Amino acid sequence: MADEDDGLQLNICYLQRVPKKEINSKAEEEAYFKENISNNNNFTNNRAYREKTNKNENNLNNNKNNNNNNNNNKTYNNNNSNNSYNNNNYNNNSFNNNNNNNYNNNNSNNNNNSNNNNLNKKPTFLEKKIQQEQKQKELKELKGPQHHRYRNQENEESNAIESNSNNFKDKYKFAENKTKKDEFNRPILETIESNIKVEKSETFSSMNWGSLQLSETLVRNLVGHMKHEKPTHIQEASITPILKGNDALVKAQTGSGKTLSYLIPVVQKLTEQRVTRSDGCYCVIITPTRELSSQIYEELQKLLKPFYWIVPGIIMGGENRSAEKARIRKGINILVATPGRLLDHLQNTQSFPTDNIKWCILDEADKLLDLGFEKDVTTIINLLDSKKRTMKFKRQNILVSATLSEGISRLASLSLTSPVYIGLDSKVLEKGENPFQAAEKEMLQAPKQLDQFYVEVESKERLTSLIAFIRWKTSNITIDKGDVASGNSSANSKMIVFFSSCDSVDFHHYMFSNMKMDKERGVKRTKKEQIKQDKLIQQHKQKNSKIFQTGNESDDEESDNDDSDDSDSNNSDSETDEEKEIEKQIKEATSNPNYRVKTSVFSVPIFKLHGELDQQTRTKTFFDFKNSPNGILLTTDVSARGLDLPSVNWIVQYDPCSDTKDYIHRIGRTARLGNQGCSLLFLLPSEKKYIDHLAKFNVSVKEMKVTTILQSLFYTSDGQLKKTSKSSQLESQVHDLQLLFERFLIYDSKAKEMARCAYQSFLRSYATHKADVKSIFHISYLHLGHVSKSFALRETPTELNKMSAGIKGAKAAKKGDEDTLQKQTADFKMKNYKSVNEFSDGLNDQPLQRANFHYESASGVIHNIYQRHFNRNERDEADKNSNPKEIKEKKRRLYDKKIESNKKFKSK
């Protein structure tokens, strides 16, 4: 039985059992191989067995070469059985069931034979894959990357974990390990704001208002009512030359008081003579935006408070034209206007006298040219110059701007005659160099007390980073000596966030104001304390809003007693109702463990401002944000020029500006008149070279890590540490916040449509950067899938492009019928696309419409609507009805056309 068992051959799992036989020579070994191969025809087909035979043949060839070259090869065989061989010229093979470990030390002559034998061997799948990868690496080294996305970024970070943008988990883990923690194991957030104190001598002059040859009543108004104790440097330098009557070009940095520098001398000159309303307009102030014109008008009203006989006025687009015409007919002495509406009244309003105009002031002149008002401004100046002959005096023209350019030089050559340059470098003026060329070479000036930061963020993390930063800077997340601050940081916090398009402003404002989040529970606070505190905060906000609307904390004293009694009873009833509601909420919270209070995203009010809003809402939001103690303003570049918004702490540039000069104007909304301020610029990894571009203009920007911003997600809006199961993982906090906004878009169709419009407008605005920055902000650098993620969209870019065509058509077809409107919608456009989508299961509600077939019961013939059969009778009837003369004329025309085409061809 043992011999029969030894003769068994097993082909299962590529194993074979062979009889044990002693081999004493090479010839016996070869014969032994041949016998086993002939007996095992089925097994020879297996790849593993062929590889074993090839190895054995290679060993035999190597041994023959060793005998010819007299090379002594030692073999060390560790056999578990009693059979051992003392031959040093060949190796025992692996056909024995014992474990043999062969160590061959071959000479250099055997390398050629072994290489030849390896060529005959077929490589495995893994070997092929390794070879392909090596070839690809060699090709990449020889030939550089074709696309800019795969280029290596210059100035890589020293830390390899943070430089790898794809490895988010390692980045978050590294940030968690690196952050400092207090005694209670809470992450300590860095204090970014630096307490830079600017001396008054750097902003304000040492002179008094009386030394500038101003009237006493005007000085008392400036000091007492307007609370301006001393003039600024630009006001000191500009008031005296403007009072002399010279044309002036005023250049100064933002927030230095340029408005009063030309208003004060105009008012001083008008107070010297007795001015009446019937005299008409003496001064025209042209501004680029409506908000700036309303701000100047408000400042002018304060300045003219003691001089009641001087009448100010304002005209701008969006207002009632007939009401403006009536005000002009009554008489306006100082007029603030936008260029389009002013040109309209000059051309069409006959009751607009321009004979007495002594001053024409262009505020933010460079912005007037950038917005395309150059043609309107030139026509206005030409209309005013046409009446020079009838005027008894010379008109004084003043240009005011924070930056100078070639367009302003053209405008200055048109309007100014031998002007005085105020605010430029005195060395340049002494040399006689052109001030406009010197201004282009001049570096951009930012206030010293302004801290500038930038953060490098991936596209998919932009939305969560923005929300985390706003929550950080508008809430009470401050730690002092291991305790949470009581909450004075958000009481006076204001922030302006700049976007590149109006659609983006509308989308973010709608999402931030309408979305409700679960109330984040702190570590120490209970549900009862939470509900009570939330209710108290709401009551406090309602009281403040009532006071803000009415302007008085108490009612009028001359009210009836009955009314007061009724009001007291109503107040008591409302208080009892509120107490009952609080008790109900407490009962629900104690009974239901899953009870959660819904709150808004931010704890401060949110405002929006852009050019597509109507004029009433624009003025209302502007003054509401200006007068409110805290808030967030989402806006475009409309708010970047000239607006004086007090107590703004942070400027966030979510979308970088298209022009480098607009960067200075944006950050100039904070750190005004010596106050402290900060700015933050969001950049993609491909846009990091923009920092080097700003350094050419002497603008130094510090870096802020994304992880420092995202650390604020560990805290609630009240400044407490979140009590959640995932609070120790930063990645989970970011992921949950992103999912929250994506789910909001799924259930809100209006928000989804607004997000799609914002996505398309962002791409269009990204392609409008100027030539000097085009190489940095190029649209081909964007990852469109990640950009859609930043708008909380889950659709792919191809789907969004299909939908955008439907949205544009629906906007265009406003007066069409229902069928055309339905065809232009996004759902109709995506109907066929979704049914052929590679990710669909083929079971959609509206599959592709196949060809409709009509069945004729009489003949039983199937007619396809796309394959119409020819009917001779129809052709005959058509020929009968047609006129033979017309047919001949058509044939003759076709024949003439053919002849003419042949002639042209021959001539060519």
UniProtKB/Swiss-Prot annotation:
It is found in: Nucleus, Nucleolus. Keywords: ATP-binding, Helicase, Hydrolase, Isomerase, Nucleotide-binding, Nucleus, RNA-binding. InterPro entries: DEAD/DEAH_box_helicase_dom, Helicase_ATP-bd, Helicase_C-like, P-loop_NTPase, RNA-helicase_DEAD-box_CS, SPB4-like_CTE. The keyword Magnesium does not apply. Residues 56-122 have a biased composition (Low complexity). Residues 124-144, 519-537, 872-889, 896-908 have a biased composition (Basic and acidic residues). Gene3D superfamilies: P-loop containing nucleotide triphosphate hydrolases. A motif (DEAD box) lies at residues 363-366. CDD domains: DEADc_DDX31, SF2_C_DEAD. Residues 518-738 form the Helicase C-terminal domain. GO terms for molecular function: ATP binding; ATP hydrolysis activity; RNA binding; RNA helicase activity. ATP binds at A252, Q253, T254, G255, S256, G257, K258, T259. Its main location: nucleus. Residues 55-165, 519-590, 872-908 are annotated as: Disordered. It holds the Pfam family CTE_SPB4. May have DNA helicase activity and RNA helicase activity. Probably have ssDNA and RNA dependent ATPase activity. Belongs to the DEAD box helicase family. DDX31/DBP7 subfamily. This is ATP-dependent DNA helicase DDX31. The lineage of its organism: Eukaryota, Amoebozoa, Evosea, Eumycetozoa, Dictyostelia.
